[in-house]
Amino acid sequence: NEQEKALVEKIDQLWKEMEFSWYQNGKDVIYWHWSPNYGWEMNFPLEGYNEALIVYVLAASSPTHPVPASAYHNGWARGGDIKTSAAPYGLPLELKHNGAEELGGPLFWAHYSYIGLDSRKIKDRYADYWNVVRNHALSDYRYCVENPKKYKGYGENCWGLTASYSVKGYAAHCPGENDLGVITPTAALSSFPYTPEESMRALKYFYSKGDSIWGTYGFYDAFSET
């Protein structure tokens, strides 16, 4: 309909007007921040693996302000150093998760870019992205089932570690050190394309908790039974 067409046109306009190459700051990488007040002070490069793959895809395919393929290979892929042999629970991560190389990072990394990208169709010299996101979700599930920190509630029906509100403020929950006993419903539920059976069990369990984790706008951001 006309409303949908108008939305598509606006999105297309934003993409074409975005000066992606500006965010390289003369380097072979894309930087996360630039501010008219602070310039490049933060100086934080977008390097994989995390949630930012789609930035490089949009930037490289821009018809107006593209970045070169070398920015992807030297920036996102860190000159090939993005590859890893880590395989928690026998599941190869394929790509080195920033700050969580052995067990994998927060699950939103398997979700955000793939709202707009079909991971089944993305494969390069570094990884098959379907395997990357599926194994990420499965390893998170198996970690929660194993529950090495013995938190109350974790198990086959209650799993999912990702960034959310936490016991105190915000935390990027993930297996290992950043596992704080907090389950974030979006982690398991947004993984439905990768883990349909495991995610359905989680959905039914979350639903059974009733209004203890459900409010006006749906499931609460996070909860802890510990």
Regions found by a protein language model. Give the residues of each.
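Ser/Thr/Asn(+Pro)-rich, low-complexity disordered segments
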Residues: 1-226
